[in-house]
């Protein structure tokens, strides 16, 4: 057997062998891990492209690129962890829909990737920030939307890790938080974007409509039949989650970067001042030196006094 054939046989995805899913009855296989590696490559590719393009821009024009780079790299780390079959815990399923011949208990233990929710916590606020920036949303309202988005992620993380039916309480609270953010954006931000050009308003409506559909319809459905209801196998669940994650936290943030740059920061109402580097490199204006204080001319004063004294003496002599 040639060396090349040996390397080919040794190659491949061995994440499941190196990091076995000990303690989980329902877990991903090498196919699920392969899909996670595919998602990882997508996030990494788009993140690197945006980073390369960012350094071709002036310092003050890079902020929109940062809003697209951040979610891509955060989810890149999350999917690297899941593809390596790490960042998960076994949780006993509440419903006995998925079964295997090797499980010892009914229902069995399902593999729950908490690393996915950590990725959401870091990446999900960025599409919301981008949409708010298109509308010129005030900072305090933007901060409110981000905080409620993080609240949604924490609630669903707890819901995925809870065995009892109380998981649906956290699920409902988290879904309510997503609805609150959607209402906030469609009232405050939409009222602001109506005052802008039709192109910006149309972009806002198209992209946020997609975000709302994925957040309020697709994600709840996915959670209900995967981590919540134990209907789909973890491989199928990974594909379902992966498609939604790619659209929401990879494709949308990446597409919004060139669109926002096309509109321009001034048109969107953002003006970034000169950077510290430019301020240091700029030549300093010459400082006018203060004029010296006028010194009294003592010689002139003495001459004036001598003249006055001579005149007074002459006047006295004439009087005599």
Curated annotation (Swiss-Prot):
CDD domains with a match to the protein in the record: 7tm_YRO2_fungal-like (cd15239)
Sorted UniProt keywords: Cell membrane, Membrane, Mitochondrion, Phosphoprotein, Transmembrane, Transmembrane helix
Phosphoserine, modified sites: 289, 299
Biased composition (Basic residues): 301-320
GO CC aspect terms: cellular bud; endoplasmic reticulum; mitochondrion; plasma membrane
Transmembrane domains' residue ranges: 35-55, 63-83, 117-137, 142-162, 168-188, 205-225, 239-259
Gene (name only): MRH1
Extracellular face residues: 1-34, 84-116, 163-167, 226-238
Family membership noted in the UniProt record: Belongs to the archaeal/bacterial/fungal opsin family.
Region (Disordered): 285-320
Top-level lineage group: Eukaryota
Note: Present with 182000 molecules/cell in log phase SD medium.
Modified residues (Phosphothreonine): 295
InterPro entries given in the database record: Arc/bac/fun_rhodopsins, Yro2-like_7TM
Protein location: Cell membrane; Mitochondrion; Bud
Protein name: Protein MRH1
Spans within the Cytoplasmic topological domain: 56-62, 138-141, 189-204, 260-320
Membrane topology: Multi-pass membrane protein
């Amino acid at each position: 057997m040639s060396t090349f054939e040996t390397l080919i046989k040794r190659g491949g995805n061995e994440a499941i062998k190196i990091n076995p899913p000990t303690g989980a009855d329902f877990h991903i296989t090498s196919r699920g891990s392969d899909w996670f590696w595919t998602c990882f490559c997508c996030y990494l590719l788009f993140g690197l492209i945006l980073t390369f393009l960012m350094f071709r821009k002036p310092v003050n024009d890079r902020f929109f690129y940062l809003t697209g780079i951040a979610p891509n790299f955060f989810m890149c780390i999350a999917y690297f962890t899941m593809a390596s079959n790490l960042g998960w815990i076994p949780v006993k399923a509440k419903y006995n829909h998925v079964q295997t011949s090797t499980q010892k208990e009914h229902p069995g233990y399902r593999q729950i990737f908490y690393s996915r929710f950590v990725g959401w916590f870091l990446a999900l606020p960025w599409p919301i920030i981008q949409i708010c920036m298109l509308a010129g949303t005030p900072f305090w309202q933007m901060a409110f939307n981000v905080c409620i988005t993080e609240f949604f992620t924490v609630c669903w993380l707890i819901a995925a890790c809870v065995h009892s039916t109380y998981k649906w309480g956290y699920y409902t609270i988290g879904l309510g938080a997503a609805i609150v953010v959607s209402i906030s954006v469609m009232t405050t931000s939409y009222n602001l974007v109506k005052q802008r050009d039709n192109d910006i308003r149309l972009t806002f409506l198209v992209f946020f409509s997609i975000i709302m559909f994925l957040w309020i319809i697709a994600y709840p459905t996915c959670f209900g039949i995967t981590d919540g209801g134990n209907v789909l196998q973890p491989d199928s669940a990974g594909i379902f989650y992966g498609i939604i994650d790619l659209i929401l936290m990879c494709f949308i943030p990446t597409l919004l970067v060139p669109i926002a740059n096309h509109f321009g920061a001034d048109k969107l109402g953002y003006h970034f001042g000169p950077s510290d580097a430019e301020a240091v490199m700029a030549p300093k204006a010459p400082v006018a030196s203060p004029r010296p204080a006028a010194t009294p001319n003592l010689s002139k004063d003495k001459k004036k006094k001598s003249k006055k004294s001579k005149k007074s003496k002459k006047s006295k002599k004439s009087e005599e």
